């Protein structure tokens, strides 16, 4: 399964059999879904995210009303940061808070899959 990363657009393109799965890193932190379907050779942003004023949605950056986690097609949404949809996971911290703020750090693409000890 080829995995291609476009550094200039911060786009991951996974190809498997007859399908493609495409994700992008936005705002240096959030992994968003762009495409899943029939295998394509390259992504030309035909299904790109539309950035428009989200005045009635929570904006993590008060100076950018076009960005809201509540409308972003996140790959792994979390709770407590302005996204009111169901989260992908839940936690409870020692202080009782259920809010988390996970973000993308980096990636590594390896050839093949790693061997699992004992299998």
How would you describe each model-predicted region?
Residues 1-119:
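N-terminal accessory beta-strand-rich subdomains and adjacent acidic, glycine-rich linkers
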């Amino acid at each position: 399964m080829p995995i291609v990363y476009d550094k200039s657009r911060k786009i991951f393109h996974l190809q498997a059999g007859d399908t493609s799965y495409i994700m992008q890193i936005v705002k240096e932190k959030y992994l968003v879904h762009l495409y899943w379907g029939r295998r394509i050779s390259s992504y030309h942003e035909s299904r790109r995210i539309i950035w428009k004023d989200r005045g009635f949605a929570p904006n993590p950056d008060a100076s950018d009303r076009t960005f809201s986690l509540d409308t972003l097609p996140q790959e792994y949404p979390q709770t407590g940061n302005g996204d009111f949809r169901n989260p992908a996971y839940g936690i409870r911290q020692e202080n009782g808070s259920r809010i988390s703020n996970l973000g993308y750090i980096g990636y590594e693409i390896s050839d093949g899959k790693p061997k699992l000890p004992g299998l």
